[in-house]
From Swiss-Prot:
This is RNA-directed DNA polymerase from mobile element jockey. It comes from the Eukaryota. It comes from Drosophila funebris. Disulfide bonds: none annotated. Its cofactor is Mg(2+); Mn(2+). The lineage of its organism: Eukaryota, Metazoa, Ecdysozoa, Arthropoda, Hexapoda. Its EC number is 2.7.7.49.
Amino acid sequence: MTQPTIKIGLWMHRGLTRGSEELRLFLSVHNIDVMLVTESHMREGQRIFLPGYSTYHVFHPSGNSRGGASVIVRSSISHSPQPPISTNDRQIAYIQLQTAEGPVVLAAVYLPPRERWIRAEFESLFAVLGNKFIAGGDYNAKHAWWGNSRACARGKVLQEVVANGQYQILATGEPTFYSYNPLVSPSALDFFVVNGYDMRRLNVQTLHELSSDHTPLLADLHAMPINKPPRSCLLARGADIERFKAYLTQHIDLSVGIQGTDDIDNAIDSFMDILKRAAIRSAPSHQQNVESSRQLQLPPIVASLIRLKRKVRREYARTGDARIQQIHSRLANRLHKVLNRRKQSQIDNLLENLDTDGSTNFSLWRITKRYKTQATPNSAIRNPAGGWCRTSREKTEVFANHLEQRFKALAFAPESHSLMVAESLQTPFQMALPADPVTLEEVKELVSKLKPKKAPGEDLLDNRTIRLLPDQALLYLVLIFNSILRVGYFPKARPTASIIMILKPGKQPLDVDSYRPTSLLPSLGKMLERLILNRILTSEEVTRAIPKFQFGFRLQHGTPEQLHRVVNFALEALEKKEYAGSCFLDIQQAFDRVWHPGLLYKAKSLLSPQLFQLIKSFWEGRKFSVTADGCRSSVKFIEAGVPQGSVLGPTLYSIFTADMPNQNAVTGLAEGEVLIATYADDIAVLTKSTCIVEATDALQEYLDAFQEWAVKWNVSINAGKCANVTFTNAIRDCPGVTINGSLLSHTHEYKYLGVILDRSLTFRRHITSLQHSFRTRITKMNWLLAARNKLSLDNKVKIYKCIVAPGLFYAIQVYGIAARTHLNKIRVLQAKMLRKISGAPWYMRTRDIECDLKVPKIGDKIREVAKKYHERLDSHPNSLARRLGVAAQRSASPRSRVRRRLKRHHPQDLLDRALT
């Protein structure tokens, strides 16, 4: 039996991006598990893509393309990145690899020359790596111990540290550096420093491959790596679907009686057991090995060049003949060109076959998806003690402990109020009609709308499998769902949510607070939540209770309508020479800190007894665990909050905040002089008056009422993130306002619902921000949109229209009122983009390019979006939004209309606005 081995490569390259294709061949040919690369010459933001591998870089502190180190590890092996070390005298990238005997640290070390090292520095360096490590790299240290004819000062110090400590040197004894200067003697600069391993378990050899003045080393560590658990679902790909359906139809018994809570849990367990047995019986007999299918197939010319270059490299190492070194350089350059041509040919073939239809599996959208979402880096994080999480298990536990404290309600409410809420929850219900029963047609419609590519919960039952269930199984689910509605019991069979952490945009990946949780909930539980939600939303009490100014989580309500309300209110103030004072509130951990008793207290007066009992049961005993890098944390309990990722959570949050103060909280102004605008937890409050003090006093009056409400219901307001903006054309600003005794920062602009609102509503800063984000997005997609690549022009235009342009035109029905000077910046962006993707010559007019590519001009686009938007407003279900429509504006009485004083546009003017 072959002993399990971890293959570790070591190479000093002087520029990883240039030789990535040759490195990819090296990894495939030698089946490398971990590759340590020094002098990678990578800069912040640069990345290389090696299929099947994860890369971790450390950059030179200067930010230039020099020095640096990289660790390349097979993605299927369980590992944890460690915090990189980057100073002028050392750059170290290292990971912790999981083996059957415990973790081992593998480090890529680069120590630049001309830096003086003393013994204490080496000892501190190795102490950071721990008790069990293999640190390979270019130490720029010479000594006879690892194959040099003479020793340098740094080599003597390192030899002394190794000789007097527990460390050992793993080297071939042969030179690894062959300078291009024939006057410089070959030397052994690349080797491994090992700690915690018997040297009999390690082998090393020199490979005369790869194009560099350093030869790579290949070490074999006799140990068993631990692989990450594969992503799986209940029904395997390639399963016999007909056999799966037949087994379910035959073994599901519809005559079972479900009376109480235990019967419901037993019925669900029985259903899942039958599903598992059916999945096992229908599983394919042979499953393809994905790793083996990804082995590179080398063309004959590439294979022959590699063999010849390897042979010449050995001959040069043996003789040191300068003429042989020249032949080797020519072969290396030719191999580099052949590999680049091969890579470009593969890219051209890929681009030629991209399309948007189902025959290519929507390949164009799949390849552009990575540019639409921010990838969460696999980074080391700090623990509460200020140290670093060394393993994936530690990372998941730190995340879980952080969330456990986060999922606890605050204790601001007075004791008398808390007692009143508790007593109210104990009072009995009055008699009420039962909820509408679930029907087979309702379940079928719900199943048909499930997205098949959603990740499953911990029960591994995904939406794709649910969509394949036969009618017999769906009828069984109908029976279970109706029993749940009748009994008022949310099943506890699988209450544990699997949480993954996603990095917030623009945050540091090293801090726990920089991540937000997303729950992977069982699919059947989500179906049940959807059925409950449908019955909650049909309740007139609920629809009346949620205020009209709450536009979040509501059908036919979007962010443009709420932005329009805020902008329209401020514009009216500008036209009347008024001051519009505004406050944008930030609720700290709004969804995670929802006080459950307070929510149940409010829901009890709105829901039927059965639905209330279901919601109450929904909270009881909820648990979660955090998953990262294939490891799962211990199970923790949830004491507060609405689960992010659940179906019921958003509506329950709206019910919890339904009684927040409205315009009536302000007594000093008329109702029309106060605006409340909320979208989920984004809250904007505006007051206007010709008197700056009066507007500020009214705003302060509302903030005092809101703070009182927040304390009463255990809601925390983050005063440091709240902002106070005065919308006016005058120079003066409103006096400061406070909340909970903290003075809010006064700014001249604020980003609300994705749009930057400046004090004069010119939208200049917003359009400048759009320019930066547009250019960043285009830079990432340059290889797809270049004029001379093989992607068809039609597909390039589709990418622009569907991926790039929506970021420009978001909320243009609101910010389209900006001056022509600012909107021309958007026109220039589109013109340059279309000229780039079409390769049109300089003398061709932009309007002709837009016409040929069937891309509307900016002015036409604004009018088109505004027309559809105002048609939607005229029939909007919310009266607050209908007031913004053109029909409502025209039918309003002359006295209620705002007299136009300024030479500027309003959103309703965009229907007829012309941009030349």
